[in-house]
Each structure stands twice: as structure tokens, then as C-alpha cells.
Amino acid sequence: MKKSCALVLSFCLLLGAASVPAFAWGAATHAYIAGKLGKIWPLMNANERYGIMAADLFNYDFQYYFNSTVKLYTHGGPGAEGFMGVWANARWWGYQKSLAFGFVAHNEVWGCDYTAHVRGLTYGQGVGYVVAKATELMPDLAALLGSHGFSLDDPVLLEVCHNLVEAAGDILILRADPTIGEKIISACLLRSNDFPGLLASAMGPAWKDAVIAAEKEFRRTMILYGAALTQGQEPAVKAFAEHLAQLGVELIKFLGGPDIPLDLAKGLAESGIRQALNLCRSDYLPEVNATVSFVKANLAAHGVWY
């Protein structure tokens, strides 16, 4: 118990020392999906896992929050699939295709994030599974905030609930695969050094330094995130709540909301994660598994195979 508490404390302190907020929004879920989609060979699958997580590498620096170029090359949008440049530029030798396979699988046009944020398969049809669950969580979180004299505009409240649902989803993935934390760590440690250059080659020379800096911080954060998951559900919930509170306070201010005290935010975050766990307990894995089949078919249809 003391060992677990010490590791969780270290996780929170190290993340809190980062220059910008950093939190993995559904990284374990993406890593789990990559394990179902990709190759059985360990080094290939480790790079696929890293690639699928790394599409979110810019998410943790608010200066890129509304950046259309970042969205185009990491997640895409209707009729805009800049992320495919990573696949097109990846060489067949080494692990570049493994990285690119995972990276492209993440996209929001026909990849993993489509079912989370656009159109769910088993739940949340028309809005996306995560968006649907976040919307359901909003009244409870609004009531909790209101009991302390705070309120958020609906778009900001939805964004906060979205992050709570994704954190809860990763806890449910941990229940399904107790080794997911180790798999995230190994993906970060074994990832090919080609990744930053591969993404920069798609985004263009002007983005090279930004990609290198963001990827360095992202990789460090993912190692810590995986370490928190290795400690089991309760320590992970507390670690996630600790840092989601830090992220949430800054995100709410960034989006024009009130300055919520950090101590209050910690309690709200933990309560929100636990409520989200109850909302997602029965149908999260069915949606994730349906997403695996959906993405596998779409990868083949778009010529993404190796």
C-alpha cells in the first residue's frame, strides 16, 4: 500500500511539474485497440500502440487547442485526411509502417475517434459514445459544482465531462487487461526514433521543432500514465483525479470559465470519474470491441496494411 501511494504521489508531482497541463485522454483505450488491430510480433505491436496514442501528442498544450493544422494532421475532419500523409511517408523498412498504422487508426474521420466523438456503434449513435456519456454526466457534475457556488457554460461543462468519461474508460480497460499499464510503458520505451521525423514530414518543415518538443513531453507523460495504471484501479483513479483536477482548472480558465480552487477540483474530479464508471460500466467494452471491427475494416478499405 505504501509503495502504491508513493508511486501515485510521484506521478502527480512529476506531471504537476510539467510546463503545460498533460493528461492522457483515453490512452489506455487506444493502446488496447491497437493490440486487437495490429501485428502479433512484440516490437511491431509496441510501435503500433505508440502510434495510436501519439495522435494526441498536441492535446496537452493549450496553444494548439484550436489549431486547424494540428487537427488536420492528427485527427482530420470531413473531407480532410491530412493524417494519411504519415502513412504515405512511412518507409517499409524498420518500424515506420508500424508507427503509421497505429497513428492512422486513431483518426476521427473513419478511425477510433469517429466512434467516440462522431457516431457510436452500440451506443451514442449520431453523437459518439464518449460524447453521449459525457452529456449524461453533465447534470450530475453541474449539481456538484452548483453546491459549491460554481457554474459552467454547457460547452465547457461538456468538455470537462468528456475528459472524465475518457479517464473512466481507461479504468474499465484496466479491468479488462490488467497489463495495459506495462504495455503503454513498453510502447514508449521501444518506439522507433523515427516517429517525430515521420510526423514532421507530413506536417511540413515549419512544424519540426514543435513536433519534437511535443513528442518528448508526450512520451514522458505516457510512461508516467502507464506506471499509474500498473498500481491497480484505486490508486489509478486517485492519480487520474489528482491530475485531471490540475488540467481541468487550467482548461476551464482557458475556455473563459471561473477559477475553481484546486482542492475542490480534486474532489469533483474523483467523484466525476466514479460516476462516469457507473455510466459506462455495462457498455464500454462492447463499444470498444465494435470499434475494433469497424476500424479494422476501414484500414483495409483505405489501403492501410503491411
Predicted feature residues:
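Positively charged n-region of N-terminal signal peptides that target proteins for export
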Residues: M1-V8
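N-terminal leader/auxiliary helical segments
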Residues: C12-Y306
